[in-house]
Amino acid sequence: MLLTAIIILFLGFTTSVVGRCGTRPPSDTVRALHVEAEVQENAANAQRTLDRPIFISVLNTHFANSNTGFRFNLISQQTIQNDAWVNVVPSSAQELEMKSALRQGRYRDLNLYIVTIENDPPLLGYATFPEQNPSQTIRSLDGVVIIPNSLPGGVAPYNLGLTGVHEVGHWLSLFHTFEPNPNSEPETGCTGPGDYVIDTPAEDSPAYGCPVGRDSCPTQRGLDPITNYMDYTDDACMTHFTLGQGLRMRTLFATLRSFV
């Protein structure tokens, strides 16, 4: 079973959510590449108490249900009081300062930051993809960021903790199921390599709600994978990773994170 570590950093709350995920694409090198986990947590300016072990249970339940080979153990957590870090702007000097100060462990160790995200449109979370030979800056920025209202007990319909599952999927090298072909005009997920996983049906664009029977790529096999954790549907609609996604996560974790 593959091993990694999670460090959860609790930093703030938000009251409105629009965007499901703000994870940015990885380098071309990672795109071309075809797990018991330990968890550490930090938190700042918490406005209410969350049962963070419940969230770790959510991760373990959903990763185990799909036989991914990953399991998460919370090994540390912190509550940080710092007004400058309550609202994090992605890809900002503020984010680098916060993560440089708080990040723990090795490149294989997942640091999870729970904080309000300042972005237009608002985001539920974002993550970093693994890189080959990561620089010190890339190592410092590595991890997953989610807002508190995406955790169990937050604001529906994204309040069952599956934003964290989705973003950890990115941290473990998974793309969106609707990953667009950059060489198409307009961009579409119906052509090109998609998410580089053979057993996820092609999907033209993100799905919202729970549109059963949606088929946005009618010339491709299968209906849209609306119940996959790497789509944008409601938490209650999401049920699984595929076997191919599990294989990709295990392979790239071992290749890019396991010994770093």
Predicted region positions:
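Fungal secretory targeting signals
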Residues: M1-R20
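Structural recognition of the beta-strand scaffold that forms the well-ordered cores
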Residues: A44, P53-I54, R71-L74, D109-I114, ...
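Pan-zinc metallopeptidase signature
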Residues: L2, A236-V260
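Propeptide-to-catalytic entry region of secreted or membrane-anchored zinc metalloproteases
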Residues: V18-L110, V115-E118, A254-F259
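Stable alpha-helical elements in mature extracytoplasmic
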Residues: F55, Q94, L160-G164, T242-R248, ...
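Residues that flank catalytic or metal-binding motifs in active/ligand-binding sites
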Residues: T68, R106-R108, S140-D142, N159, ...
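Active-site-proximal segment of zinc-dependent metalloprotease catalytic domains
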Residues: S100-E179
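The catalytic-center signature of Zn2+-dependent metalloproteases
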Residues: P152-T239
